[in-house]
Regions:
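SF2 helicase catalytic motif II
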Residues: 328-332, 340-380, 385
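Conserved helicase motor
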Residues: 9-13, 269, 290-304, 453-456, ...
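C-terminal helicase lobe and adjacent C-terminal extensions/tails of nucleic-acid helicase motors
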Residues: 87, 378, 437-445, 451, ...
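Conserved Walker A/P-loop ATP-binding site and its immediately adjacent core
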Residues: 259-283, 292-295, 394
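Accessory nucleic-acid engagement/destabilization modules that flank
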Residues: 1-197
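Interdomain hinge/linker at the junction between the two RecA-like core domains of SF2 helicases
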Residues: 390-443
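Walker A/P-loop
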Residues: 227-250
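Inter-Walker segment of RecA-like/P-loop motor cores
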Residues: 284-336
Length: 716
């Protein structure tokens, strides 16, 4: 047996990789990845120990078609014997996902960490001890900052990320018969030169508004070069150019401090495409990754999705490019996930600049876990965090609780007079309006935007408008369709043609349109101010002629919005100037007070992590920013028809899924069931869902969720 070669992988053409070769390759990568947060030794240990269980005769038979073998528990057991808990957990989950810790008394063989360890301690694993004749495990110490349960759990997930990426990468390099090469992309210095070229046309600025925007941009560039990693706010009024300004800060800091990448986190999928497109124009396609539901390649967590089958997913799963644009859902759910594919990218958040656009949109029921995770990345993983918004939320007390030693700096301090220079609208209140009365008011105006709280209300108001120049926007329209309508809206606004738009809130965040008048259904003050940002956006009309009308609709407010609407009403009733910084601060403070600290962690994520032993799987099951997970239904319309045909033929690729995302609509479970019952859907082999009944989609209002002619099923 001394000359027996224990194998880790075997290709169809007969090439072999020994276990020792794989362990050394994985350990080298894992150590390099973990170096970003000073955990090289932990990475080396996890990499060398993760596949020790493959040193069994049973696993060697598995390579030739034998039954499945638990090869992860052996390495976990050896690391635990060495008192290296983080490495033990990471190894335990490197194929099936991080388990719940459970308790020491768990029955051997149960799915918890202790159940697996107890099985190993009772000698119920296949004999794997041949590894001891080939190498010994390296020594490692757990970083001091990972001493508490909360911080230890976060560190373990980050180490797990390093191990998964290293394991998949080394295996993929062997299976592809090509050495691992980091993603080919430009340096931060080169990206900075491209940014300078992009903004050079803005100088010298013309007009007062552009002068203010350029001043903000220059201040952000200067602050980025001046400050090291930390916690920052960027409070810029709507129209102040905060997207490029925040990017400029991040790039200046990344260049000056040799940071690795910029991650731009956006609340809505509906605006991610346009932001990513701007970044591609600045930096080039090869330097920007757009990551959300429409571009993911779904991969199941079992042996069938081991590294051998992962080439389609590498760039999406690793985030190893300089600029990533993603959604808050993907970002935060990954930070609390337990699956290998979702966690693989996490180590690349270390030494990165994280920009949270529209930070006020962080969902209240998950606010404390979200803020805690940001604080962890800044405190212990060399990241910078920028909370970027035109309506800064009162998050300071929560950050001070979780990161008391880190000051929160405002990147661009705005004196009240400076803020006033961006005032472009006046507000008025209209009380309660029926949908008929509202439509009559809109009909009297040539160009007007109306934003309501639900998709049902948007349809009802839209259908009561008559004549030409009327448009409807909602998330029931696929992105390419919405973009085409927005292009037509902008053209009509520019040419002075009739243009009445009824929309849900999707138009509020970052959509570049400029109306002379806006109606906004009563909502949270942040939403009201976002809607106001679509009125007189370029400052070409006097504020007194640019009216934002706040009204109460005929439907009761959706339960989801009750608290924010209540806080907004308090501010409207008591603050003379609802757009002042004082009113904004009052709103967010009131919003947090109305719910209290417990409502900011409604699913008790942080208490669970403190009281239980590393409950990875339970936390992942609880942490869903969107309470009702949606399913993407693809529309075989326009280019989407050909793309769906490619899916049907099995031609899966990242590019295909990204392009298909432009022809997808997110549908909630109850609506999906209604469409299913009506026979309106087709399910493809890769799990994709396609609308079979094209008659359910109209060019005016998008997807109809009432296929049987019954009551409509709409949500906000």
């Amino acid at each position: 047996m001394d000359t027996y070669a224990y194998l880790a992988h075997l290709t169809e053409d007969g090439r072999t990789q020994t276990i020792l070769e794989h362990l050394k390759g994985t350990a080298s990568l894992c150590s390099a990845f973990a170096a970003a947060f000073d955990a090289e030794a932990q990475g080396q240990l996890a990499g060398m120990a993760h596949d020790i269980g493959k040193y069994s005769a049973a696993f060697q038979r598995r390579l030739h078609g034998g039954p499945k073998v638990d090869h992860a528990s052996a390495g976990a057991f050896e690391c635990l014997k060495a008192q290296q808990l983080a490495a033990a957990f990471a190894i335990s989950g490197h194929h099936g996902g991080l388990p719940d810790g459970g308790g020491r008394g768990d029955a051997a063989g149960t799915g918890t960490f202790w159940g697996r360890i107890n099985r190993a301690s009772q000698g119920r694993l296949e004999d794997y001890h041949a590894w001891q004749s080939e190498f010994s495990l390296p020594h490692a110490n757990t970083p001091a900052f990972a001493g508490t349960r909360l911080e230890g759990m976060f560190f373990t997930r980050m180490l797990f990320s390093c191990l998964v990426d290293a394991d998949y990468t080394d295996t993929g390099a062997f299976m592809d018969n090509s050495p691992y090469l980091p993603a080919s992309s430009s340096s931060m210095e080169e990206l900075w030169r491209r940014l300078e070229t992009y903004v050079s046309g803005w100088f010298p600025p013309k007009g007062a508004l552009n002068m203010q925007r350029c001043a903000i941009l220059e201040q952000c560039m200067s602050a980025g070069a001046q400050y090291g990693p930390g916690l920052f706010t960027l409070t810029v009024p709507t129209g102040g150019g905060k997207t490029v300004a925040s990017l400029s800060f991040a790039l200046a800091q990344a260049k000056a401090r040799r940071m690795k990448r910029i991650v731009y986190v956006i609340p809505y999928t509906s605006i991610i495409e346009q932001t990513a497109q701007v970044f591609r124009e600045i930096f080039g396609d090869e330097n920007v990754l757009e990551f959300h539901f429409g571009v993911q390649f779904d991969q199941q967590e079992d042996d069938a999705s081991s590294p051998e089958t992962a080439p389609l997913t590498r760039s999406v799963e690793t985030w190893d490019v300089p600029v990533i644009v993603t959604t808050a859902v993907q970002f935060f759910e990954s930070l609390y996930a337990c699956q290998p594919s979702k966690c693989r990218k996490l180590h690349n958040l270390a030494q990165s600049v994280l920009i949270f656009d529209e930070a006020q949109m962080l969902p209240l029921p998950y606010l404390r876990p979200c803020v805690w995770a940001i604080a962890q990345l800044v405190r212990h993983y060399g990241a910078s965090a920028v909370l970027c918004t035109a309506t800064q939320p009162a998050l300071d007390p929560i950050f001070q609780e979780f990161a008391p030693e880190i000051p929160i700096r405002e990147i661009c301090p705005m004196a009240e007079a400076h803020w006033e220079s961006f005032r472009r609208v006046s507000f008025q209140q209209a009380g309660t309006l029926s949908w008929m009365d509202l439509a009559a008011r809109l009909q009297q105006q040539e160009q007007v935007l109306c934003v309501v709280n639900t998709r049902r209300a948007a349809r009802e108001v839209f259908h009561q408008l008559s004549g030409s120049g009327n448009f409807h926007l909602s998330t029931l329209m696929y992105p390419a369709h919405r973009r085409r309508i927005l292009d037509e809206i902008r053209r009509r606004l520019r040419d002075g043609l009739p243009c009445r738009v009824v929309s849900t809130s999707l138009i509020e965040a970052g959509v570049d349109v400029d109306f002379p008048a806006v109606y906004r259904e009563l909502s949270g003050l942040d939403s009201i101010l976002q809607a106001a940002g679509r009125c007189n956006r370029e400052g070409k009309r006097p504020p007194e002629d640019s009216i934002v009308t706040i009204f109460q609709g005929e439907d009761p407010p959706p339960r989801l919005f009750e608290t924010s609407i209540g806080a907004g009403k308090i501010v409207l009733d008591h603050c003379q100037d609802v757009s002042s910084r004082a009113a904004i601060h009052t709103y967010f403070s009131t919003l947090l007070d109305l719910k209290g600290a417990e409502a900011q962690d409604a699913h008790h994520i942080l208490p669970l992590m403190e009281s239980e032993f590393f409950p990875f799987r339970t936390v992942a099951e609880r942490f869903h920013l969107i309470e009702s997970p949606t399913t993407t239904v693809y529309l075989p319309l326009e280019e989407g028809a050909g793309l769906v045909e490619l899916l049907r033929s099995g031609q899966y690729s990242r590019t295909l899924y990204r392009r298909l995302g432009q022809y997808g609509v997110s549908v909630y479970p109850q609506h999906l069931a209604a469409l299913e019952q009506a026979g309106a859907l087709e399910h493809l082999e890769d799990g994709s869902v396609v609308l079979r009944d094209i008659g359910l989609y109209t060019q005016t209002t998008g997807l109809t969720l009432e296929p049987s002619g019954g009551n409509a099923l709409f949500i906000g």
